UniProtKB/Swiss-Prot annotation:
Keywords: D-amino acid, Hydroxylation, Neurotoxin, Secreted, Toxin. One of its GO terms (cellular component) is extracellular region. The modification D-4-hydroxyvaline is found at V6. It comes from Conus gladiator (Gladiator cone). The modification D-valine is found at V6. The mature peptide does not contain cysteine residue. The lineage of its organism: Eukaryota, Metazoa, Spiralia, Lophotrochozoa, Mollusca. GO terms for molecular function: toxin activity. May act as a neurotoxin. This is Conophan gld-V. It comes from the Eukaryota. Expressed by the venom duct. It is found in: Secreted. The modification 4-hydroxyproline is found at P2. Belongs to the conophan family.
Amino acid sequence: APANSVWS
């Protein structure tokens, strides 16, 4: 899994 995730 990625270390960060972006939510908009």
